[in-house]
Design a protein with these regions (language model features):
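Active-site beta3 strand of CheY-like receiver
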Residues: 45-51
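Conserved phosphotransfer cores of two-component systems
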Residues: 43-45, 68-74, 96
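C-terminal output helix
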Residues: 105-116
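Receiver (REC) domain active-site loop signature in two-component systems and cognate sites
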Residues: 56
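Two-component/phosphorelay signaling modules centered on CheY-like receiver
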Residues: 12-30
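Acidic catalytic/metal-coordinating carboxylates
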Residues: 34-37, 60-64
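Alpha4 helix (beta4-alpha4-beta5 surface) of REC/receiver domains from two-component response regulators
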Residues: 63, 84-100, 113
């Protein structure tokens, strides 16, 4: 069984695409469509890494990131977002210390390589 990745995004098409790409590469994929759903699932089962969108209703990715990091300090976390401004990348990578910052649209090969690097495959 491959490494387990949690994908959190409020857009079902994005979740389905990322899930398909990662499962094709042998990863097991957990999904959540909101920050609250992600936190509930994390309490039951811990993945090897989490990929999360930034722009989500109710709890955005920045807030979700902080909540996950508080409780699961060593869990690799990456932002998966359309927000490609330098200020967003700086906040994600250097202020919050995300393990990666992946912008949409992303290439299949690039996504897989970056996830493998995060989980050390």
């Amino acid at each position: 069984m491959g490494k387990k990745i949690m994908v959190v995004d409020d857009e079902p098409d994005t979740v389905d695409l990322v899930k398909l790409v990662l499962e094709t590469e042998g990863f097991e994929v957990m999904t959540a469509f909101s920050g609250a759903e992600c936190l509930k699932k994390l309490a039951l089962e811990k993945p090897d890494a989490v990929l999360m969108d930034i722009m989500m209703p109710e709890m955005d990715g920045w807030e979700l990131f902080k909540k996950i990091r508080e409780k699961y300090k060593d869990l690799p976390l990456a932002m998966l977002t359309v927000r490609n401004r330098d200020i967003d990348k700086m906040l994600g990578l250097h202020v919050l210390k995300a393990d990666d910052y992946i912008t949409k649209p992303f290439g299949r090969k690039d996504l897989v390589e970056r996830v493998k690097k995060m989980v050390k495959v």
